[in-house]
Amino acid sequence: MKKTILSLLALLSLAVGVNAQTTWNLDKVHSNVKFAVSHMVVSEVEGSFKIFDGNLVASKADLSDAKINFSVDVASVNTDNERRDGHLKSDDFFNAEKFPKMTFVGKSMKPLGNNKYKLTGDLTIRDVTKTVDFDVTYGGQINTGRGIKAGFKAKATIDRLQYGLKYAPALEAGGLAVGKDVEITVLVEMDQAK
């Protein structure tokens, strides 16, 4: 009887362990949030955000049930040009004073095979929320001896005009001075919570 109870307890603890949630916190030093947008139709301008945070919580090994939360401080925008950064913080674009954060809340993370995922979630900029799909590449996990790390690369393209980033002077030759489509690239390294 005692062996049966111990076996049952061992099985139960194994089952609980399999379904236990694992939390991953952002390693901000080894992560970045970048964007690129066309400029004057003929070139691109790149930039990044310096202040951001996020986490991922999942109980399945394939991360298909992952819950992802990410936020960016829009006033931390950096294009290596102070004047342009000031313009991006203005009401023509982010209006950082009134809308200091942009957020992403993941709704589903669908495994596609070969460490590829389709991450779908709600992106909110200037209090406008739209569903966005990110193409995600999972870099895997490694035990560093001080903890477990995981890496991800996520890419999406959004129409900035749909979010109220309204600066859109037309060029005489056609097109916009600043393109409407913005490529977002998020490179993250995450630490498994202990």
For the regions a protein language model found, what residue spans apply to each?
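Bacterial Sec-dependent N-terminal signal peptides
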Residues: 1-23
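Low-complexity, acidic/polar, glycine-enriched regions of mature
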Residues: 20-194
